[in-house]
Design a protein with these regions (language model features):
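Single-stranded RNA-binding regions, centering on S1/OB-family and related RNA-binding modules
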Residues: 1-308
Length: 308
């Protein structure tokens, strides 16, 4: 299966630079049907994209801007939002403008069609791939899974520990690993992420009763305060006034109960702070997962994901 990278990851490669180095090189890339990448300079009033090719400019006509733009399944914002960003394309021809300057006619849609036929259409639930975060909403993360084609990672599938917004975990432009959760009849893919962040036991093995460790307050309830120790592990401390969600904390681990997936904590201190988002720790390098069981063996409550 051919792998297609997200937009922005090939623009600085030697082969891409060589293809943009001269008109002759661009003509050769047209003949060989090579996929190239360059920066979109503007989107005109007809929503054609103008692209900087270095030795000349290129135009991506509106109907060549994206797969699905013709039938309306992809909106024009998908083109407008590419301005000042890299776009992938194939050169489908050359023309002269009113000033007798040669320019290239480009197709982004052709690259996306190739990506869909040779890569995305062959994915199945449980496949683990890399993707790039393109933008975030309250409900989830939009990912470039190849050639500018997007998929969705819902917020409740990012981690076991609940979060208020995806920006707690990710940043725009970040490359992450995700697992294919489902594919609908239109070929739209929904992803998950929490299955790659380790089981309860794998995360709990990094801690021990008697330790005082850092955490983040994720939820304050009348019966207690949930503190995240890792993205896939949280514990419960007694309620204390003046502590709110988002606070950083130092917590003492009182006990750990694998058979109930419970960690009892004592909050030593809680405070407001701005710390860098820690790097993601993945617990598996597999490229496919059939089933993932979060719960420890013998636990009465079963938390699992079945992709088979």
């Amino acid at each position: 299966m051919q792998i297609f990278k997200p937009e922005g990851q090939t623009i600085l490669t030697p082969s891409n630079r060589a293809a943009l180095s001269s008109p002759n090189a661009l003509h050769e890339a047209c003949i060989t049907n090579e996929t190239l990448e360059a920066r979109a300079l503007l989107c005109d009033k007809e929503h054609n994209l103008r692209v900087d090719l270095g030795c000349m400019y290129g135009i991506i006509p509106h109907n060549e801007g994206a797969l699905g733009i013709d039938d309306g399944s992809v909106r024009d914002i998908a083109l407008i939002s590419r301005v000042n960003k890299p776009v992938m394309f194939k050169i489908i021809g050359f023309q002269k403008d009113d000033n007798d300057r040669e320019y290239a006619i480009l197709s982004r849609k052709a690259v996306q069609r190739e990506c869909m036929d040779n890569y995305i259409s062959r994915l199945c639930p449980g496949d683990v791939i890399t993707a790039k975060v393109t933008h975030m909403e309250n409900f989830g993360v939009f990912l470039d899974i190849g050639a500018g084609i997007n998929g969705l990672l819902p917020i409740d599938s990012i981690s076991v520990s609940r979060i208020p917004h995806p920006s707690v975990r990710f940043s725009v432009g970040q490359t992450i690993r995700v697992v294919v959760k489902s594919i609908d009849e239109q070929g739209r893919i929904t992803f998950s992420h929490k299955e790659l962040l380790g089981t309860w036991e794998q995360n709990a093995d990094e801690f021990a009763p008697g330790e005082t460790v850092p955490g983040i307050v994720r939820s304050v309830e009348s019966y207690g305060i949930f503190v995240e120790l890792t993205p896939n592990l949280a514990g419960l401390a007694e309620y204390s006034a003046g502590i709110s969600a988002g606070c950083h904390a130092g917590v003492y681990i009182k006990s750990m109960l694998p058979e109930r997936m419970k960690i009892k904590l004592i909050i030593v201190d809680a405070f407001e702070a701005e710390y860098p988002t820690p790097p993601i720790k993945y617990f598996t390098e597999l490229d496919h997962i059939d089933k993932w069981v979060y719960s420890p063996a013998g636990c009465s409550k079963i938390i699992e994901s079945d992709f088979s």
